[in-house]
Curated annotation (Swiss-Prot):
This is Antiholin-like protein LrgB. One of its GO terms (cellular component) is plasma membrane. Pfam families: LrgB. It comes from Bacillus cereus (strain ATCC 14579 / DSM 31 / CCUG 7414 / JCM 2152 / NBRC 15305 / NCIMB 9373 / NCTC 2599 / NRRL B-3711). Belongs to the CidB/LrgB family. LrgB subfamily. The keyword Transmembrane applies. It comes from the Bacteria.
Length: 230
């Protein structure tokens, strides 16, 4: 079957699954479990399983969609441009907050994975979950992780932030728009930015820069943990 499969198969499956997710999210008035990315992932898994298709057959076209993830992150520069004055004024506080948050995320995942006895491949797959998909997947592959698990971890993490991010900020009385945006972007990448956009331009801009910096920090920090994994 693999020899007769065309790239359009993976593309069509992805678009239909995402379209269904978008409709469910709209008609459920934003219910977090119907976030389009999460729904598309679940429907894709079910379709491949029921149809007895292999991941390789799907990924012939799926990887073509993945190719556009990296250039798509350029869109994060738009809200940043609008808030460049605040970025210049608070650059040190912004950078230090994101770096500390990124490192803490990797450390927590590492400790929890060790504590519950996850095997090396699964642990390696979980470590990059703080980064956006375009960055997390290459990191996972480079350290021997399983991209499918990494993708699930990234999306699940983002869904949690999308659903509960505003509640956490309110609970811990985080009121400054810069702090809100940094927290959302550092913890929830693209969906964190979506929440930031709903809150305001400053939150959106700070969330956007957090997504970018978290990716860079994750690339640098994760190799430091590799000697301890085994």
């Amino acid at each position: 079957m693999a020899s007769t499969m065309t790239p359009y198969f993976g593309i069509v499956v992805s678009l239909i699954a995402y379209g269904i997710g978008t409709l469910l999210f709209k008609h459920s008035k934003g219910f977090f479990l119907f976030t389009p990315l999460f729904v598309a992932m679940v429907l894709g898994i079910v379709f491949l399983k029921v149809g007895n298709f292999t991941f390789e057959e799907y990924n012939t076209g799926g990887k073509m969609i993945s190719f556009f993830l990296e250039p798509a992150t350029i869109a994060f520069a738009i809200p940043l441009y609008k808030q460049v004055d605040k970025l210049k004024k608070y650059w040190w506080q912004i950078l230090s907050a994101i770096v500390v948050g990124s490192i803490c995320s990797v450390i927590v995942v590492f400790i929890v994975a060790k504590a519950i006895g996850l095997d090396t491949a699964v642990m390696n797959s979980m470590l990059p979950q703080a980064a956006t998909t375009a960055i997390a997947l290459p990191i996972s592959e480079s350290i021997g992780g399983i991209p499918a698990i990494t993708s699930f971890a990234v999306i699940f993490n983002a869904v949690i932030v999308y659903a509960l991010g505003a509640l956490f900020l309110k609970t811990f009385r985080v009121k400054h728009p810069i702090a809100k945006g940094l927290a959302l972007g550092t913890a929830g990448h693209a969906l964190g930015v979506a929440v930031g956009i709903e809150m305001g331009e400053v939150e959106a801009a700070m969330a956007s820069i957090a997504v970018t910096v978290v990716g860079v920090v994750t690339v640098v920090v994760i190799p430091m943990f590799m000697p301890f994994i085994g």
